Curated annotation (Swiss-Prot):
This is Peptide chain release factor 1, mitochondrial. The modification N5-methylglutamine is found at Q268. It comes from Kluyveromyces lactis (strain ATCC 8585 / CBS 2359 / DSM 70799 / NBRC 1267 / NRRL Y-1140 / WM37). Residues 317-340 are annotated as: Disordered. One of its GO terms (biological process) is mitochondrial translation. One of its GO terms (molecular function) is translation release factor activity. Belongs to the prokaryotic/mitochondrial release factor family. The keyword Protein biosynthesis applies. Transmembrane segments: none annotated.
Amino acid sequence: MISKLFGRGKFFRNVALQVRFNSSEAVEFRPLHSSLISRAELYVNELRELEDLLSQGGSFDLEKQKNFAKLSTIVDSYSKYREEVNQYKELQEILELDPSLREEAEADIAALLPDLNKTGDSLLNKLLPPHPFADKPSILELRPGVGGSEAMIFTQDLLNMYINYANYHKWKWNLISKTENASGSGVLEAILNIDEPGSYDKLKFEAGVHRVQRVPATESKGRTHTSTAAVIVLPKMGEESESDAYERTFKPDEIRIDVMRASGKGGQHVNTTDSAVRLTHYPSGIVISMQEERSQHRNKAKAFAILRARLAEKERLEKEEKERNARKDQVSTTDRSDKIRTYNYPQNRITDHRCGFTLYDIEGVMKGERLDDVIDAMDAFSSEQKAKQLLQDMSA
């Protein structure tokens, strides 16, 4: 049993359990809690039972097939984690028993630890309850905050970053709508659709206020300005799937649909038909306006897709709030709408204020190539918080 390893005093006597996110600090082993290891062992036994059932000619319905696939991924991750922990244990024993091999063992440990922690994080994510919209595509809404025209330019930069990120991962995307400022140098509002299943789970922690510190091109005295932009990340709900739990059929008295002529720049851009659509959802007060397409039908479909996404996210947040309020101790959350990240151009630094992760490569992040470094750090931090809550619930 791998859980017994965690009880060996010499092995873990000096191991720091605190999670480290700053990339400049030394890497240390972050062992999973023994209760989580026991949980993984339960999944191993459950998978064996399903395999025995299959070997005996038992029938597998759709639910059993889904469960088999889920358990297989967990057990595979657990097996890899256990193997790497055993390697780490052997190297630690070499350090204690054979001083002549100390330098080589230390080098091997330094090479092993990043992979071991990454494997542990992957296993932890599989052991935690999944996000209700983990498999959904995503819709990103971006709007400038404080900072005037520089905030609008920064909003355009963030939009480009997410498009670059989607291209880097070869995800399909399209702009649902984009409204530029008068000069065309910045964005007043942009709505980006990333049509990749699971992209919501990957991007959900991008929601919040992003802050930039840099010298604007129009600044003659070289002073650094601070501007902000707000990002909203929504799950894209199915439009036709009857099995989707959040698929809605709106009652006539819930929705008001207004159609009108689209506004434009004049000339060929003026739409002479009533193609623009505005939806008003009375129960929530949400209003969606859409005029990007020349077809009223397409504008209406896009507007309803955004409305479904906003309502689904609203219901999820309300449910989480009720669950938090039901606990005796208030649980910290990463769903805050305040400043989440700073992009400091003079220092070439990006810092996520929720988990404390810092990366010195703004260009790599804005190109989409290193955004995963920031996202993964926040994801690991969130998983740690969820694991703590899960352990509290298990011991209650």
